[in-house]
């Protein structure tokens, strides 16, 4: 992910130096708080993204997740972002699948998957067939953080 982040932060800084951030809105997908930090607060004006998770997401579960993360890893730990949180969500999903199936066997999990739902930092995640249905949020960059402005619904 470093080359992608590096390309994004270089682009954001060049965009701001050219003055385009004052008149052109950008929608960049699959960026996280790490890109904002690498870009610098002066290069994030007019930047939006859509994602399933933001560190600033105002859900009760996310506030607890962030608090536990800070307690465990300290203030010098990397910012929580969509990539790291997705790894955590994967473990939550596996736990919910195994609990519903009452087994770790693939066949049992496969049979149980359509009855699985859980609450995670991003909100409620529900299995529908072989896919998850989960919230996606629109956020605007506010210097080095994202401000979640809407939940996008299908």
Predicted feature residues:
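Short, small-residue-biased leader/transition segments that mark boundaries at the very start
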Residues: 2-7
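A generic local structural motif
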Residues: 12-15, 125
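N-terminal start-of-chain detector that recognizes signal peptides
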Residues: 1, 19-27, 66, 93, ...
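Tryptophan-centric aromatic hotspots in well-structured domains and transmembrane helices
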Residues: 11-12, 54, 93-94, 146
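Cytochrome P450 catalytic core segment centered on helix I
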Residues: 149
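Extracellular/periplasmic periplasmic-binding protein-like sensory domains
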Residues: 15-88, 142, 152-153
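Extracytoplasmic/secreted proteins, especially bacterial periplasmic and envelope-associated proteins
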Residues: 10, 60, 64, 68, ...
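Segments of small-molecule ligand-sensing domains
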Residues: 71-84, 95-146
């Amino acid at each position: 992910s470093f080359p992608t982040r590096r390309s994004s932060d270089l682009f954001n800084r060049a965009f701001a130096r050219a003055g385009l951030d004052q008149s052109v809105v950008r929608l960049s997908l699959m960026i996280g708080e790490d890109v904002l930090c690498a870009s610098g607060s002066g290069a994030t004006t007019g930047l939006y993204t859509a994602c399933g998770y933001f560190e600033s997401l105002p859900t009760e579960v996310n506030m607890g997740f962030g608090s536990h993360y800070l307690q465990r890893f300290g203030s010098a730990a990397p910012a929580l972002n969509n990539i790291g949180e997705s790894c955590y969500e994967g473990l939550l999903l596996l736990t919910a699948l195994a609990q519903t199936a009452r087994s770790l066997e693939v066949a049992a999990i496969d049979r149980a998957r359509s009855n699985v739902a859980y609450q995670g930092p991003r909100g409620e995640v529900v299995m529908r067939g072989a896919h998850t249905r989960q919230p996606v949020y629109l956020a605007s960059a506010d210097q080095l953080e994202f401000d979640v402005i809407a939940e996008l619904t299908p």
